[in-house]
Amino acid sequence: MRHWLVALAALAVVSFLGAQERNLEHADVNLWENTTFHQESVDCSRLTEGIIRAKIDGSWQEFEIRQLPSGFQEWSFGKRAATLERFRTGQPPELAGPHNGMVATSGIARSDSRFAINNAVKGMGWLPYDEKLAEVIELLESTIDEEFSAKLDRLDSLYKQGTRLYDPTRQVSLELYSTPEFETGTFLNQMVNPACAVVFLDIPSYEFKAIAHLMHPDDPKLTETEKLQVQYANLIHSYFHGAFDKQFIGVVYYVIEVYDNSPGKPEAKGKRVVPELPLMP
């Protein structure tokens, strides 16, 4: 009996040490090449045709990229202008609104979980048209050291341009936390299964389903436009929050479907508004 107890104790120690050596905040698949990565599950080569290809649930599929509807645009730009005004008067931002997108994903479980599903709040924003990226980047870089009030005015003037400046087929975000040593559930899922849903807590309440394109700033395979997208995403983040000592992973969400989840409206309550029914996406 004593021999069995010694053996079990030894096994427990070995198991504990093994768990200590294994990085549980990581997946059992390596998505990195040293300190960078290239997302292999998204093909952006046909964006000029309005098409994005993605590997979803193990098979490559084509998706037509669509515009966020006018209602979403008016709500988003209007709420952003109102948030800038709150900062001018010394008030904190609201949690509700177009900045905080709740991103639902599914793909691969992190080693500390039995579930491959994940949900996380991500800061979202508008992305200028490809041909306007360099111009906006130059403007932001030349004014980033101005007084905060002046920067608020400049952001307000940019938002007032609406879709004359910003591309209504996409939203942009940053993956702030994922590294070769630590991977978020959102990062893991989007790397292997880039389809996701993004919903906003507000009234009206919009949801869009999208293909997420992840771009590491040091990825040598990025196109010139993709490099500018990553640069812009980091710059607009620093423009408001202050400088950071690193460039973060950029994420562009290409819009495929849009839903109006607003309560109390018979034409909403989860109805798909883009593309309009009965057309299948």
Regions found by a protein language model. Name each.
Residues 2-8:
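Sec-dependent signal peptide recognition
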Residues 19-281:
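Binding-site signature for planar aromatic cofactors or substrates
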